[in-house]
């Protein structure tokens, strides 16, 4: 076998392989001889089939098998001889495979770059710390109490904000009743904003048994396109007005939520608020780490990985329909520049984190996969069991989580052992403002 390096530049390695016809013929003859001892052909005793008969029957398939083996062996030989760290599958080009001629082909391989992990001790990351105040907890308790309100006390007085109205209504557009505009025994709490903007406010002052005319304009983004942006008139028959029975926030209230006391419920809400903030805080810290890594990393990346990442980004953008918000008033060239820059950032950081995980001997454990699945489940409230069943019945889908799980593990290891963390305390409103500004910054990247 003769080899000629055609290209060894950057991350591209191309090499031409030439194998003499004599070597191919020898391999084929050896395989045919072996077959004469194994095959059974009518009219011949086992092991006594003439090689010419075997060659006529199996020659073409034997030759194909030998060629395929030679190609695979050549690829493995080249990788080992030149100590190549390749990505993806080698590509075989310019295959010359005619009978009675030498076997020639070109192996084209894309190499992984040499990655030097930067000095992570030079990186400082702010770690926001939420301080949950008693007022934060009381606000949550009041919201819960509001949800638990009961409207059992019927009122003969005029309806006011916070009262529940039971009504029949018919809606008209240009004096013509429209489909879906009829309500029967419909209940709404004034001020809940459950109906079209302005509807509930016009019910204030009404009484049981009265008729009210409500004039509204459907929002431009209303789900029924034929009504969007149109003026409408509703004739409302107020059937009953109920005032809310006050909910007392005490130990008995707490017991409705599997807590033994009000104090225990307060502790539960404190932890809940802290936990809800942790995921957002982790995202901020991760993006800040990636921002600094982007400035430190400067190595070539494989074109195949870049193209793959661009396709993933485009798919994600199409699904989330962010094109209008992110790329509004942007030219096609600016959109392409955005994708190119973000894809390069993602690939470089992903390769560096993979190298870091390898260097620190980090492995994906079952708990890491469960954590990733639980994170996904929180995005689908009410459908958690469906998601769990999906992964339970799809081992390949679980396998695809190993990459993200290892990246998360590497990031956490960096936070725990490598970079400098500076904790800064925030109250809830300050943290919400920080999260909002960071989300806007990330979206605009």
Curated annotation (Swiss-Prot):
> Which GO BP terms sit in this record?
'de novo' cotranslational protein folding; cell division; chaperone-mediated protein folding; protein transport; protein unfolding
Sorted alphabetically, the Gene Ontology cellular component annotations on this record are: cytoplasm
Listed Gene3D superfamilies: 3.10.50.40, Trigger factor ribosome-binding domain (3.30.70.1050), Trigger factor, C-terminal domain (1.10.3120.10)
SUPFAM superfamilies under this entry?
A: FKBP-like (SSF54534), Triger factor/SurA peptide-binding domain-like (SSF109998), Trigger factor ribosome-binding domain (SSF102735)
Location of the protein in the cell: Cytoplasm
Q: Is Isomerase found in the keyword set?
A: yes
Q: Name one GO molecular function term.
A: ribosome binding
Q: Known EC number(s)?
A: 5.2.1.8
Q: Which family does it belong to?
A: Belongs to the FKBP-type PPIase family. Tig subfamily.
Question: What's this chain's function?
Answer: Involved in protein export. Acts as a chaperone by maintaining the newly synthesized protein in an open conformation. Functions as a peptidyl-prolyl cis-trans isomerase.
Q: What is this protein called?
A: Trigger factor
């Amino acid at each position: 076998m003769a080899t000629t390096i055609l290209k060894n530049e950057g991350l591209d390695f191309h090499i031409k392989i030439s194998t003499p016809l004599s070597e191919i013929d020898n391999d084929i003859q050896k395989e045919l001889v072996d077959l004469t001892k194994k095959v059974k052909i009518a009219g011949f005793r086992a092991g006594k089939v003439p090689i010419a008969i075997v060659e006529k029957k199996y020659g073409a398939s034997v030759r194909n098998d030998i060629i395929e083996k030679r190609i695979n062996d050549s690829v493995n030989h080249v990788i080992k001889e030149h100590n190549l760290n390749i990505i993806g599958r080698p590509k075989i080009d310019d295959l010359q495979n005619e009978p009675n001629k030498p076997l020639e082909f070109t192996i084209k391989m894309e190499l992984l770059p040499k990655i030097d992990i930067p000095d992570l001790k030079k990186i400082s990351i702010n770690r926001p710390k939420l301080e949950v105040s008693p007022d934060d907890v009381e606000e949550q308790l009041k919201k819960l109490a509001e949800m638990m309100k009961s409207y059992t006390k019927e009122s003969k007085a005029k309806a006011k904000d916070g009262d529940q109205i039971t009504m029949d209504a018919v809606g008209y557009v240009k004096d013509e009743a429209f489909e879906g505009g009829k309500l029967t025994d419909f209940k709404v709490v004034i001020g809940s904003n459950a109906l079209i903007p302005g509807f509930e406010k016009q019910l204030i002052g009404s009484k049981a048994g009265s008729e009210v005319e409500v004039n509204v304009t459907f929002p431009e983004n209303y789900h029924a396109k034929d009504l969007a942006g149109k003026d409408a008139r509703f004739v409302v028959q107020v059937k009953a007005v109920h005032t809310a029975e006050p909910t007392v926030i005490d130990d008995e209230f707490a017991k409705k939520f599997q807590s033994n006391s009000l104090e225990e419920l307060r502790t539960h809400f404190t932890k809940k608020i802290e936990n809800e903030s942790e995921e957002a805080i982790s995202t901020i810290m991760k993006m800040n780490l990636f921002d600094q890594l982007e400035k430190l990393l400067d190595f070539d990346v494989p074109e195949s990985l870049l193209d793959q990442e661009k396709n993933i980004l485009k798919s994600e953008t199409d699904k989330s329909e962010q094109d209008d918000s992110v790329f509004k008033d942007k030219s096609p060239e600016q959109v392409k520049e955005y994708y190119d820059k973000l894809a390069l950032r993602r690939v470089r950081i992903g390769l560096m984190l993979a190298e870091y995980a390898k260097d620190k001997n980090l492995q994906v454990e079952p708990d890491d996969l469960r954590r990733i699945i639980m994170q996904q489940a929180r995005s689908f409230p009410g459908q958690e069991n469906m998601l769990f069943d999906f992964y339970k019945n799809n081992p390949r889908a679980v396998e695809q989580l190993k990459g993200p799980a290892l990246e998360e593990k590497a990031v956490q290891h960096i936070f725990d052992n490598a970079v400098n963390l500076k904790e800064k305390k925030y109250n809830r409103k300050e943290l919400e403002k920080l999260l909002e500004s960071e989300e806007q910054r990330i979206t605009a990247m």
